[in-house]
Amino acid sequence: IALVGDAAHCIGESTKVIDAEGQLIAPGFLDGHIHIESSMMTPIEYAKAVIPHGTVGIYYDPHEVCNVLGLKGVDLMAEEAEKTPLKAMLTTPSCVPAVPGFEDSGAEITAADIASEMKHDYTVGLGEMMNFPGITSSAEPTHNIPGETLKAGKIITGHYSIPETGCGL
């Protein structure tokens, strides 16, 4: 809502006017962290399920799809998410596999891959950093991944500690 009252001076050729007199207006919900594929739905079906309940935007991290299909899977999800009415903001998976040597995956993400993915308009930042050993041991390949995100001027998301708890990641 930009203005309540007479807005005649703001109306132009491409302005969409919605007469909401007598109606209730509520803000939409923005989901700050979601893995669409965990719902066992495609982005289109996910949008159909959540929009009627007030979700209008999502920050999504398709790391499970990336574990299977690599960046091709991430890009396929992003292309489909753009076809929905949701404001879908991709956070590129940061850890594929989540912890190298701990699990098998169908792909591997490097800092060069992250640099490439950050060039997409639909990519707003980096998804959760799950490689706890790589971060705490200051492993250069692990640290280069968020570094590429910062070079691109984009955000880094994740599971962070609360200083008051004294806990780690």
Positions of PLM-derived features:
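Histidine-rich, glycine-flanked metal-binding segment
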Residues: 1-27
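Short loop/edge segments at beta-strand edges and connector loops
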Residues: 5-6, 92, 160
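Loop-rich non-cytosolic ectodomains and luminal regions
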Residues: 14-16, 28, 110, 148, ...
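Di-metal (Zn2+ and/or Mg2+/Mn2+) metal-binding site signature of metallo-dependent hydrolases
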Residues: 23-46
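Histidine-centered active-site/metal-ligand motif
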Residues: 33-35, 63, 159-160
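Divalent-metal coordination cores built from histidine and acidic residues
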Residues: 44-154
